[in-house]
Swiss-Prot record:
Disulphide bridges: C28-C172, C50-C106
Glycan attachment sites: N197, N206, N235, N249, N256
Homology family: Belongs to the EPO/TPO family.
A Pfam family matched in the record: EPO_TPO
Function per UniProt: Lineage-specific cytokine affecting the proliferation and maturation of megakaryocytes from their committed progenitor cells. It acts at a late stage of megakaryocyte development. It may be the major physiological regulator of circulating platelets.
Predominant subcellular localization, coarse grouping: secreted
Keyword set, alphabetical order: Cytokine, Disulfide bond, Glycoprotein, Hormone, Secreted, Signal
Region (Disordered): 307-326
Protein name in the entry: Thrombopoietin
A GO CC annotation given for this chain: extracellular space
Ranges of Pro residues composition bias in the record: 308-326
Cell location: Secreted
Amino acid sequence: MELTDLLLVAILLLTARLTLSSPVPPACDPRLLNKLLRDSYLLHSRLSQCPDVNPLSIPVLLPAVDFSLGEWKTQTEQSKAQDILGAVSLLLEGVMAARGQLEPSCLSSLLGQLSGQVRLLLGALQGLLGTQLPPQGRTTAHKDPSALFLSLQQLLRGKVRFLLLVEGPALCVRRTLPTTAVPSRTSQLLTLNKFPNRTSGLLETNFSVVARTAGPGLLNRLQGFRAKIIPGQLNQTSGSLDQIPGYLNGTHEPVNGTHGLFAGTSLQTLEAPDVVPGAFNKGSLPLNLQSGLPPIPSLAADGYTLFPPSPTFPTPGSPPQLPPVS
């Protein structure tokens, strides 16, 4: 693997490391500017080690890298960003054009490494300033390959450095605000309102089913509801109805509310003391104060009973039949 490929891999790893180590753009990390300055000086020093460095056959256009602090202060933030992006983009085009004129050589390898550094700088600046199309700035034509390396150094020491040190903190804060912004209370309420109220819908469905149930009264409704219970489902038993007496409660003794659906052994306890009259929206009947049960309706709704009464239940008042003890 050539030295150029190794440098490109190192640049990619550095970019990924700077991106993952902090939530801010890579240009906001001061280590990036220091690294680019150090590498540009080192790369330029290696140019003297290449034999037969000749001028380019075709001059390349390079950006004007002269810097004036007074002129810099009079420019707007947008004009500064466009000026720097245009200069770095033009420098990258000049380096690629110069390398395209050369055969594989020491100078060509150095120009490849230089293009990698310029690409890294351009990507970092675009992450901070955006990818807006920069205007065409002032250019100068050069045939000396050394001018390519010097242009990068002057850009880093001048416009890029002042941008990152003076304008950079405010730009970095502005770029990181969208990723750390907390949604407002209004958006949270709107998001919560999108979810259906499943609890209220379930209660409404249950109330409507009970309200449409026709039968002699609350006792038949409860009996019909009990008749629909699957044996063994509530108490995790696997026997049939004939084999398991008292299958609803799963025990052979009166139970509390923890071992069955209904507590007690007599249907007299199934009176509705906890049911508030008028709790059901439609079809609710007034309770008979003497028996605790609603009167028999004169007409069944729709001509049928949704939960028919079970013929296997004992009559009210009769004690449960316990199996003989062997």
